[in-house]
Amino acid sequence: MTSVINVNLPTQSYEIAIAPASLDQIGQSLAGLKLGKKVLLVSNPTIFKHFGKVAVDSLEAAGFQVASYSLPAGERYKTLNSIQKLYDIALENRLERSSTMVALGGGVIGDMTGFAAATWLRGINVVQVPTTLLAMVDSAIGGKTGVNHPHGKNLIGAFHQPRFVLIDPQVLKTLPVREFRAGMAEVIKYGVIWDAELFNQLEQSKRLDQLRYIKPELVDAILTRSCQAKADVVGKDEKEGGLRAILNYGHTVGHAVESLTNYRLLKHGEAVGIGMVAAGQIAVNLELWQQADADRQNALIEKAGLPTKLPVGLDIEGIIEALQLDKKVKDGKVRFVLPTQIGVVTVTDEVTSDHIRQVLQQM
C-alpha cells in the first residue's frame, strides 16, 4: 500500500511517499522532479552495504551520474569535520546548483546531508531516504538540518526543505532493535502532542518494543499518522515561529541528557523518552495535566522498551545548566512543551529550576 503525504509550504512544497519495496524505484521518483544529472549519495557503511547498490543502480538506470560517500555512523560524528568531508566530495565531483544530495540513512546522515546541501553553493537539492524509524517519522521531514556543537545538540544548522522524501517500510526489517525502540519515542510523542487516536492505537498493541510483534496495519498507522502529524505542524509553521516548537516535546531535558553524556550513552530516542517522562511530571506538578494521563504515557514508553529514569550518576545541576543552551530559550527563559491532555500541549516559560530539580530528583 502506497501513501503519499503532502507537505504544503509557501516556499517549496513536496511529497512524502510511503511505499513498500520502493527503494529500487528511487531513480524513477527523482527523474520526475526535473533535477540536474549529478547526484551525491551519502550514507553510512552499514546502510550502504544493505541498500547502497540498489539505490545507486536505480539512480544510474534513470540517467543520473552518481557519486557515493559513507560517513561513520553515530551522533558523535555529527560535526563540522564531517560536513567538510562532504564539501570535499562535492567539489571533487563538481556538484552544481542543479545537483542533488541524497541522504540514505538515519537521522544523523539526514541532518548532515541536509546541512551540506543547504550550504554548498548556497543551497542545492536534497532528497531524504530515511532508513530508521526515527528518521522516517521525524528528522527526514520538515527541513531541519545541522550538526552538533561540543556544548550542545544541533546548535549549528539551517532550514532546508527536501525536494522529496521516500520511505520504504521494508528497510525497517534490518534495523537493530535498539534503533527501532528509539524511533518509537518520536511516535509516542506525536500521540501526546497531536494525535490522540494514534496514542489509543499504540495502547491497544500488546507490544511496541520490536517490529516483529507489531501488526502490519499498526506499522502503517505509525508511519502515515506520524508523518501526517509532522507535515501538518510544519505546514502551519515552517521555521518554528510558534506552533512547530511543540515537536520538541521531551527534547528539552532529552537534549541536555544527550549532551552531558557526550552522545555516547543514549540513543536520541532514549533521551527523548526520559525527557517526556520529565516533562509529563512537570506538567502534573503544575496542575496542567492529570497524573492518570502521565501514567498512560509512561506505560507506553516502557512498553516500547525505552528508559524512564536518568542515567545513574548524572549531575542534575549539570542538566539544569545545560538547559540554558537549549534552542528554545527566549529572553533567557527555558520554554517547555507540556501536555494538558492526550493530543494537546502548551508551550510555557513558567517552569522554574526548582520545578525541574524536583522532578529530576525523583528520576
From Swiss-Prot:
Keywords: Amino-acid biosynthesis, Aromatic amino acid biosynthesis, Cobalt, Cytoplasm, Lyase, Metal-binding, NAD, Nucleotide-binding, Zinc. It catalyses: 7-phospho-2-dehydro-3-deoxy-D-arabino-heptonate = 3-dehydroquinate + phosphate. Gene3D superfamilies: 3.40.50.1970, Dehydroquinate synthase-like - alpha domain (1.20.1090.10). Its EC number is 4.2.3.4. NAD(+) binds at G107, V108, I109, G110, D111, T131, T132, K144, K153. GO terms for cellular component: cytoplasm. InterPro entries: Dehydroquinate_synthase, DHQ_synth_AroB, DHQ_synth_fam, DHQS/DOIS_N, DHQS_C. Zn(2+) binds at E186, H251, H268. Belongs to the sugar phosphate cyclases superfamily. Dehydroquinate synthase family. This is 3-dehydroquinate synthase. It comes from Nostoc sp. (strain PCC 7120 / SAG 25.82 / UTEX 2576). The lineage of its organism: Bacteria, Bacillati, Cyanobacteriota, Cyanophyceae, Nostocales. The gene is aroB.
